[in-house]
Amino acid sequence: GFAPEIRVAWAQCRQEQTDAVLATIVSRHGSMPREVGTKMLILPDGSTAGSVGGGIMEYRARQLAGKMLTGTEAPQQLASFATGLEDDEKALAACGGSMELFLQVLAGGTEAK
């Protein structure tokens, strides 16, 4: 299901017919703050509803979502993120955590299931 803040934000997007990106954790490895299935809605202005763990991972997810919303990236993506440093291998070694997110553009006039 969806957290209440995601439902509220998505209802606003639908009312305004504004697209958004839904990010869902589909796998995680090592030490991570959120569980598989956790969702976050990324709005066109870069703001979010919900959280997939914060920090650099959410920053990178917001960057990718922005590109998806402008059409410079495919509307569905499976992306890997690691905590910590810029280099993912160093980040995995330093913090011991990584995750995969499935990101999909939701059209503002559609229902989220």
Question: Where are the regions a protein language model picked out?
Answer:
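Segments forming oxygen-rich coordination pockets for charged ligands
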Residues: 1-113
